[in-house]
Amino acid sequence: CHNKSVIKLTNSEVSLCEKHFNIYFEKKVRKTIRVYKMVAKQDAIGVAISGGKDSISLLYILNKIFKPSKIKLIAVAIDEGIKGYRDPNFAYVKKFCKKLKIQLKICSFKKEFGNTLDEITKKDKKTIPCTYCGVFRRKLLNEKAIELGATKLATGHNLDDEAQSILMNQLRKNIRASAILGPITGIKDDPSFVRRIKPFYFLTEKEVITFAYINNILDKYVECPNSILGYRRTIQETLNDLENKYPGTKHNIISSFLSVLPLLKKSFESAEIKKCKLCNAPTSKDICQACVLLER
């Protein structure tokens, strides 16, 4: 059409106006959900939400797609207890969920683990906050999803996020962690684990930001002050540099990974899913990583 372009698609020469980009975005999400059979008619979907562009956009588009059906959406937020970080973001999350008439559940590290993340890292100055945060967040999201009756847990991970995770696992020689990745996480179904789905798997970070902006759902998001300390930030910057020099790099990483993912998952299918001896959570070891960290 002749309307003003709002974005030039990555890995393509196509430029789209606001109207046609929204159509493109929704079609891509619907296709990803359909092709990977992410959602069934009887599902209730927990949506991990932080207030950032990815999770807000995810809740917005899933509400649009599933509102006509009987599929229930439940927003789940985690308050890690980082000074000056969550309060302003959660104020918007509450307002946004109320507007969409979606149930919101907020749980905290303080209530569930006895300490905020700030308190934990003061006691253990040798370990970066991201180590605790990632493990505890995953544990809580799974537990709360089960408590709320969710059969799937949707996360806002986009193509950039997945490419970063793939590269991180390769550099750390963590093959099992790679096998758990993909549009639907995990290796096999287990009643103690809610499978995670990634409807934004084939959408770039640039596309998600553009979607949030043109639909006026992007609030002033306070970034986590600890993010600059994490290994992921280094990988993110490296991949962005490669993408700038060699456009299509991130798409190629995803495409190559998906071609070997079925073999990766198959190689770990026979692995036993154990129960943590301390908290009964699903784990590949005798004691889950969350309990290992809590015992420090």
Where do the PLM segments sit?
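Flexible helical/loop "lid" subdomain adjacent to adenine-nucleotide binding pockets
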Residues: E26, R34, A44, K152, ...
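ATP-dependent adenylation/nucleotidyltransferase module used to activate substrates
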Residues: C1-P183, F202-N215, C288
